[in-house]
Amino acid sequence: MKKLIVPLFFLLMIHVSSNELDPVAVLQEFVGVDTVNPPGNETNAVNFYASIFDRLGIEYETAESAPGRGNIWARIKGGSLPALMLLQHTDVVPADEAYWDTNPLKGTIKDGYLYGRGVIDMKGLGVAQLFAFLDAYKNKEKLNRDIVFMATADEEAGGFFGAGWMLENHPEAFDGVKLLLNEGGSGTSYGDKQVFSVEVTQKVPVWLRLKSEGSPGHGSSPQTTSSVTQLIEALSNLYNNPFDARIIDPVDTYFKALAVDMDGEEKTQFTNMPKTILEEGFLESLQASSPSWHALTRDTCSITMLEGSSKINVVPPVAFAEVDCRMLPDRGVDEFLNDFKERVSSYGIEIELIMAFGPAVSSTESELFRAIEKVTKQEYPNSRVVPAVSTGFTDSHFTREIGIESFGFNPMLSEAGDFRGVHGNNERVNITAYRKSVEDLKLILQEVAFNK
């Protein structure tokens, strides 16, 4: 298998024995490995993991989908049961240090938290997966199935240089894999009770580019209409006419599970969400209090990018907008696009599909889902595990599309609101909770992959 020449400082930080590795220290180092996407440079992360595998004598393979866009994977051979993959992405979104209390690309410990870009999404879980993989390697004689570790590029921009590329160009890495753990769900503490969500499906991203054309001219002589005004009118109509609300089965199950720990009117509302969404003012109130819960009730579109003239005194002949739409996974993209066109086409808008994926759902009858339930209940007796629909998308859509039962789960327990730094400022993780999650992920892997 292919080996890499890695930077010396990676080798210096790694001890010979996996027993001597500290997950918090490893995560601190990993945060300092620059994989901000764009441009990605995920080969830096490949070198990071390769240095660990080299020192521990673990064979691995690597591949670049483009210069600097590295992917790495390793397999531990086990018994004859279908293989299980631990999948992570190594890229992170940009961070502006001016808005942080710490350097986002330096793992900083402060008041019991580790701060840094990616500690939640998803270098923290990635390192936890590494430690679960190393535990399996140390106990490989007990394995009832192969365990595959895979760290890929580009998830934050769609995964086309990462997991998607791997499936097309290195399908052998997925040989025999029928179970997969990825990002997507985690635990939240509500007083003395805990709810752990496991992502089983996700809203389908439909990214669109809108184009409006009109007569150019001088800014001093406004025309009755222009490319920009047409685009503004179309976007205003889109914004003011949200898609009809509906509750699909996985979302209904999730809301009912949340209702168990609620009281009074809120409990009644969440127990019967198909009826509740019809109440006047409810959806507006839900969006204000919890945008993520509201996003589970309907298809959504966020206007994220605008492009017009390059000069303030020039009326441009063409204007553009890009829109991030997320579709509930109960219908096809074509049907959604028809609904979208009804809202903008009368304004002379051309629509270009940038990206869209197909919907897929993983079964809660899976042995991996049951292992998550068992270990979580064992470690947190007052907890409940609920299947969830993610409003965002992960690389799991690639693997679900080829029949791999894929679940998004991080066993870390957090207080409500602790995840606010994801893709934002001051992303942080509680160190005590993080250490516990590393051990719990080992237990989940042992439950599903070790001979009893």
Indicate where each model-derived feature is located:
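A short core secondary-structure module
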Residues: 164-166, 220-244
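Acidic/His- and Gly-rich active-site-bordering loop/insert found
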Residues: 19-117, 123, 130, 136-145
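Acidic/histidine-rich, surface-exposed loop or edge segments in extracytoplasmic proteins
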Residues: 25-35, 211-214, 347-355
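Short amphipathic alpha-helices in soluble, non-transmembrane regions
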Residues: 225, 336-344
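Acidic/histidine-rich catalytic neighborhood of metal-dependent amide-processing enzymes
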Residues: 114, 120-197
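Second-shell loop/turn segments in exported
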Residues: 32-40, 114-119, 196, 217-221, ...
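An extended, acidic, His-containing surface patch that forms the Zn2+-binding/catalytic region
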Residues: 78, 189-190, 247-310, 317, ...
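Sec-dependent N-terminal signal peptides
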Residues: 4-13
